[in-house]
Amino acid sequence: QEEFTAITENMSEGFLVIDQETRVLTYNSAVLRLLYAQVPTEEGESVYALNREAGFRRCVEEALAGRRCEQLLEKDDDCRQIIASPVEQDGQIAGAVLVILDVTEKEQRERLRREFTANVSHELKTPLTSILGTAEILQNGLVKPEDVPHFAGNIHRETERLIGLVNDIIKLSRLDEGGGLGQWETVDLYEEARAVLEQLAPAAQRKQVTTRLQGGEALVRGVPQIVEEIVYNLCDNAIAYNRANGSVTVTVENTAFGPRITVADTGIGIPREAQGRVFERFYRVDKSHSSGGTGLGLSIVKHAAAYHGAAVELESDEGAGTTITVIFPKPDAKARP
């Protein structure tokens, strides 16, 4: 009995044994935590003193009727899985064994997977529908010759959007897996920012946004392509969600905490209630999609920064612009290879 108690008390799962009359025979302390029981239950008391939810009761009743039962119990943001199995003795149901698991993280991952799948389906469908509709109009000869370049331009634009989306999904998948992203090297954040702003100059010109780079050399350890993704997506977002005659200021500097890059814009800003969600996949403050993009840029920043052990900070007010800062570990700090 002492060995049995020692084993069950060291389990993170809840373990509970009841008899045919639903009386508690034994349980470990994890049961109280996982079933949100306010006070311990004495042996011989009804198991329903631990939890009175309908799902829990159904599981107990099914097991005592001779049928194995699984049930999810949700409370606030927590999720528990109840697995109840009948116990037979001399051909009769003598009771049941219940195992309670904390599956909160598993269910959250599954929810995120479902949301991601639904979002991907929607985001892919939009440009594909546009491409198909335009192609059908061209195929049926419903376009004047002089209008063909315009319709062809629509197809080209939507195709580029589709390719961008697929590329961003691939990047996020690789970051999720965390391996095979490339060799770690010493990277100059200032040089990366300079190259990115040069690359984005045409986009900034189209949006009538001026860009400025200030600071100096700041060396970090990381995968060059992934560090570039961080800088590119920060600057691209700052330009895309800016206003005409707005500005983007990129500051690169060394601090006591480590190399830091800050991207500040004079754009539309982010409402306070949305600031906790802007790093989610496909989340957009601009629901009209008028600013373009895939809705994955800041999610890539978040995951790429985490891969490098970097911290991300956001400051914003609606209508007053946004400032995002990424602070990398010092190059001599212990990090990935």
Predicted regions and their residues:
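Short alpha-helical segment of the dimerization/phosphotransfer core of two-component systems
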Residues: 157-162
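PAS-family sensory/regulatory modules and their coupling/dimerization elements
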Residues: 43-105
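Short conserved segment of the HATPase_c
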Residues: 270-282, 302
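Conserved micro-motifs of the catalytic ATP-binding
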Residues: 177-183, 215, 219-225
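Conserved glycine-rich
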Residues: 309-310
